[in-house]
Structure formats: structure tokens, C-alpha cells
């Protein structure tokens, strides 16, 4: 796709997103109206800078579900931050969100060189943190063998690397260094 084609797709998707949040999330509608904006004000990706941006405080102020753009009946999974610096930030996912997330992570793994012959050891936490599950689904989508060990348990991590022949390690850079030194 050439640059103009990409800009066209980005503009179309931005317009759709702005319309969806304007009509489905009262908080965003109010923020846009404060800036004198309506959905018709955004016509291309060039207008992105005119939009109010979401801050962590906005997420906290609308805890837990105030920024969801769909009814709760469409939310199939909820993730949240740990809340170590304040109120947790909450994200709700629809089935389509999960599918898109899986596709994005599959592309990310492929771009990094992973393929169906790999053993992907996921040492990110599972649970409310989003890291482990996204890579898990992305790995399955490319046909790789996923080892969902989660975080911590360093001795077991190293044992499984050796026993299973892990070829991809998904974890934080600091934990990778820690494993290398263990």
C-alpha cells in the first residue's frame, strides 16, 4: 500500500472511531464539545491533533467502566492495571477486540522472526495484566507451540527452556537479563 492509500485507511478508521466514541461515551462527547468539536469536525488523520487526548487521570476518573463504548453485554474480558500509583485503569474487550489483538500480536511475533516451528515461552504474567494473554493468542495464531508459564519461578523457567527447547522468550528485558545471569 502506498503512503496515500495508508493515509486514506487511517483517516477512514479515525472518522469511524470518533463517531463511535462521540455517540457512545458521554465523557468523550463532553470533552469534544468543550473544544467545539463534533464528529463532523474530524475528516482526516490530519485532524488528529484537534482531538482531546485521554490521560491516565481520565481513566481513573471514569473508573471502572465509564469509558466503555459498548454495552457491558458485549464485553467478554476485563483487564486492569495493578493500581500501584492510584486507582486501577480498566480496559474492557469485545470479541472483535480479542480477535484484533490476536492478529496484532501474531504480526508482531512474525515481524520478530517467530513462526509455526517455534516454542514460545511466555514469562509475562497472566491474569489482569494484558501481556501474557496477547502473546499467547498471537503465538497460537501463527501456529507456534505456546508455553504459558507466566511470570516468576526462575528455576522452573530455565528448566522448561532446556527441557522444551524454547526458541522464543517473551518477557520484560530486565527479566531476560535476570534469567541469563541465573
Segments (PLM) and residue ranges:
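Small/polar loops that bind or transfer phosphate-bearing groups
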Residues: 93, 123-124, 149, 171
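Conserved AMP-binding loop of ANL adenylate-forming enzymes
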Residues: 110-146
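Short glycine-enriched loops at secondary-structure junctions
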Residues: 75, 98, 125-127, 174
